[in-house]
Every structure is written in structure tokens, then in C-alpha cells.
A protein has these predicted regions:
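Glycine-centric low-complexity/flexibility signal
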Residues: 30, 34-35, 40-42, 46-178, ...
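Active-site-proximal C-terminal subdomain of hydrolase catalytic domains
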Residues: 208
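Boundary/junction segments of secreted and surface-exposed precursor proteins
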Residues: 1-17, 22-23
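Strand-loop-strand
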Residues: 199, 212-215
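N-terminal extracellular ligand-recognition/capping segment immediately after the signal peptide
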Residues: 18-26, 46, 53
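Active-site and glycan-interaction determinants of carbohydrate-active enzymes
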Residues: 218-220
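Transmembrane beta-barrel strand/turn architecture of Gram-negative outer membrane proteins
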Residues: 60, 211-212
Length: 242
């Protein structure tokens, strides 16, 4: 899905102020996201679906642009108890409404993740939430001023449901740089509502030879907050591998 116009040829992909949904992996000499550009992916239907990869010698995301695969992961995990947050890199928070509830187990690789976040069940309150999707970036020089996000959904306030887990962000580059240092890389769990738990954090792994102006505190796999702190638990943080 392309909203507006983009510039692409065999060598370069320049997205200027528009949104692009990728259905498969792409390779260019140069990729640039400028002036509010967004790259996303379709929602996955299978935990074994291949991760979409973007490959470029030079890759730039400016301060107004982002790659966003939030909520593009899986629907609810059959292991998940009702009202509990979903698990991925970290365990989802459990509701205290049901004394016997236990969080679903974590899944995926810490060092080279390719797994999707799961969503949580919302029985009697509508459909499930959806976990964060998965994206891989391979580049020679990757300049990141904007955002890469693979967060889990949180339910609408009326749903009273558990939240989804964060997804996966895998970056494999020669040089990762930022002129401003104001970027965000996030694969965090969504926040719960009412008696429900927060989603577990996802997984981020970054392989690099050089860092330039990279503040690692801006790389996040937070667990989601419980809906009501007295009646549910927070999601656990996910994993970050550098």
C-alpha cells in the first residue's frame, strides 16, 4: 500500500512524506525515509512467517520518520490465561482476579531474534489485541534520527483485556550513527486495562562494528504497565542484545 508518491528505481528507495506497506523483503543501494515517511508491514498470521528484511548500503531515517510494525504480530497465544498480558522476550503480567493464572512462557532467541509478539485474549469484550511485528535491517551505514517501533497493542478501555507483547527488531550494520541522538528503538509491551496485566517486552538485537552518538538508553523493551496496580501485574522487560 502506497499513500502518495515515492521515488524508487533499481538502486534507490526514497520515501518522502508517505506511507509504504512492505509485503516482502527489499534490497536497494540507498533507502531514505524523509518528512514523516512510514514503513510498515502486514499483520502476520503465522509464528513461522519469515521476517521482512530491508537491505541497503546506505540507510537513513530522519527525525520525523519511522519504521512502525506495532500491532503487526500475532493474535492471542493459546497458552495465555484470560486477562493476563502476553509474553515474548519477557513474561506478561498476570491478573490477580484468578488465583491460579500463570503467565505464558517466553519464546524466541535473545541473540538473533526472528519471533513475533503475541496478543492477549479479551473474552466477552471483543477480539484479541495483537503483538508487535518483526523487522530486520541490514546496512553498511545506518543513520537513525527517527523511530523503529515494534510495540504490542493495548486494549481499548472498555475491553478490560490483557495487553500484547512487544515484537522483534534485528539490526545488522557496519556503522550505526545518529547526529542528534534523539532516536527511539522500541519493542515494548502494551499497557493493561482494569484488572488485566501488562504485555511482556519484545526482543531487540543489534550487530555493529561502529557506533556514533548512540545512547543505548534509547533502546527499549519495556514491559507494559498493569491496568490496576492492586489487581494485576506489570509485564516483564524484554531482551536487548548488543
Amino acid at each position: 500500500l502506497v499513500t502518495g508518491e515515492i521515488s524508487s528505481d533499481d538502486d534507490n528507495l526514497i520515501i518522502n512524506g508517505y506511507s509504504l506497506e512492505l509485503i516482502n523483503s527489499q534490497e536497494f543501494n540507498k533507502i531514505e525515509l524523509l518528512n514523516g515517511a512510514v514503513i510498515t508491514t502486514p499483520r502476520t498470521s503465522s509464528p513461522t512467517q519469515s521476517v521482512i528484511e530491508l537491505i541497503a548500503s546506505e540507510f537513513l531515517i530522519d527525525a520525523t520518520s519511522k519504521i512502525d510494525v506495532s500491532g503487526k504480530g500475532l493474535s492471542f497465544d493459546p497458552q495465555n490465561e484470560q486477562y493476563d498480558g502476553a509474553s515474548h522476550g519477557g513474561k506478561g503480567g498476570i491478573t490477580l482476579w484468578f488465583a491460579d493464572n500463570k503467565p505464558a512462557v517466553t519464546h524466541g532467541s535473545i541473540t538473533y531474534p526472528s519471533s513475533y509478539g503475541y496478543g492477549a485474549q479479551i473474552p466477552a469484550y471483543g477480539g484479541p489485541t495483537y503483538g508487535g511485528g518483526a523487522i530486520k535491517i541490514s546496512a553498511g551505514i545506518f543513520t537513525l534520527e527517527g523511530k523503529i517501533i515494534a510495540d504490542g497493542d493495548q486494549p481499548y478501555a472498555s475491553n478490560k483485556g490483557g495487553s500484547a507483547a512487544g515484537g522483534t527488531i534485528l539490526i545488522d550494520v557496519n556503522k550505526l550513527r545518529s547526529e542528534t541522538g534523539n532516536f527511539i528503538i522500541s519493542a515494548s509491551g502494551g499497557n493493561g486495562v482494569d484488572v488485566a496485566g501488562g504485555g511482556g517486552g519484545g526482543r531487540v538485537a543489534i550487530y555493529y562494528n561502529e557506533f556514533e552518538h548512540i545512547d543505548i538508553s534509547r533502546i527499549q523493551t519495556f514491559g507494559g504497565l498493569a491496568g490496576n496496580f492492586d489487581r494485576a501485574g506489570h509485564g516483564e522487560a524484554g531482551t536487548i542484545y548488543l
